[in-house]
Amino acid sequence: MELKLMKTQKLTPLAQWLIIAKLNHCFKGNHLSMQEIADLFKVERISIRRAAEQLEAHGFAHRVRGKGVDMHKVYLDWDKGKVQLWEAAIKYMKPPCVRHYHVKTPANMELFTPGGLHLLSERTTHKKIDGKPHLVYKGFSQSRKRNEALIERVRPSEADYVVEFWSYPPILPGKDEMDNLSLYLSTDATGDRDMEMNHALILTTFDWDGHGHYTPRRFRRTPLSGIFGR
């Protein structure tokens, strides 16, 4: 019964990051100890253990004990190839959370995830006209500085703009920019028809095997130009 309940739940952020890290070739080989993963993500081992329990409940990975001199170690083994893992896991993945701020003037603001030093945030600014917000700006920003830019928040009655922030997972270990699969989840959640072309392009251009090849044929869409292309 407990397993059944867990399989209906959305993935926790850490479990989701582990899957996306696996798909983005952040792990060397298929066999990493729980401690190595905890060190890689700079989180406590208990957090990795809970994420592993959820991955096991969904049938995405399983834990095994090492042999010989490594008997004291517990390893995480992945049960699916990259394409199969993505196809199976996407229905349990969550889009980034959204926050709204009422402001006098539009400005950038940093939002950091728990345990993440780096964050990519999407900002949508709505101009208030006749008391109702209207879309006037949409874009992506990336920064490594926590207080690079702040926003002046005011009461809704005093605001001229409503700024919408999308909070993404931290940049993956060994990477220096946001990964395309997290962008895919974020654009899917926006409900913005202008993003649909970029949304299709993300899967088309994702490097599934680590050698620069594009997405498998069953994921292919019409090639499009956009900010997410490689």
Region spans (language model):
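Minor-groove-contacting beta-hairpin "wing" of winged helix-turn-helix DNA-binding domains
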Residues: 67-77
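Short helix-capping/hinge SLiMs at alpha-helix to coil transitions
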Residues: 23-29, 173-174
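Short acidic, hydrophobic short linear motifs in intrinsically disordered regions
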Residues: 27-41
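Short alpha-helical segments that sit at the start of domains
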Residues: 1-21
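Short glycine/proline-centered loop/turn elements that form peptide/ligand docking sites
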Residues: 9-15, 30, 50, 54, ...
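Short amphipathic alpha-helical interaction segments
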Residues: 42-57
